[in-house]
Design a protein with these regions (language model features):
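Conserved active-site-proximal phosphate/metal-binding subdomains
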Residues: 1, 6-135
């Protein structure tokens, strides 16, 4: 399995050539028509590119998020040396992700996406996404 920035057949072929037997493509499915995230979140994903992402370190891992009040606060805390535990508490656990991803509230939540969002140019169906990923 390969993951990270895979949004089309070119990326899928590249990791396949390196030995991967499958891909985990997250962000491209989040922006699909059938996804339950609000259209406002899908539009933000389509409009964004990799340079828009906010990167911060917390438990259990690094997060990439679209700009918003909470994600900007988390980046500032991370840069100021806050502990991973402090950052995890400020994120609000899964509540922060739910508010951002499922309600589009980026004041109290965050929209977590991957580095491949720059290759997502439209809101398409899951069938189209699968066809785009076909090796």
């Amino acid at each position: 399995m390969a993951a990270g920035g895979i949004t089309d057949a070119r990326g899928a072929r590249a990791v396949h050539a390196l030995g991967a037997e499958g891909v985990f493509a997250g962000s491209v499915f989040i922006s699909a028509i059938e996804s339950r995230v609000p259209d406002s979140v899908k539009a933000k994903i389509v409009a964004a590119n990799g340079l828009d992402l906010r990167l911060f370190r917390t438990l259990p891992d690094y997060y990439r998020a679209l700009p918003g009040k909470l994600s900007d606060t988390l980046v500032a805390m991370d840069r100021a040396g806050a502990s991973r535990t402090e950052l995890a508490q400020a994120m609000g656990g899964l509540r922060g992700m739910r508010l951002g991803m499922l309600e589009g509230n980026t004041d109290e939540g965050y929209i977590s996406v991957g580095a491949g969002i720059g290759n997502i140019h439209a809101i398409t169906s899951v069938a189209e996404v699968v066809n785009q990923l076909a090796v």
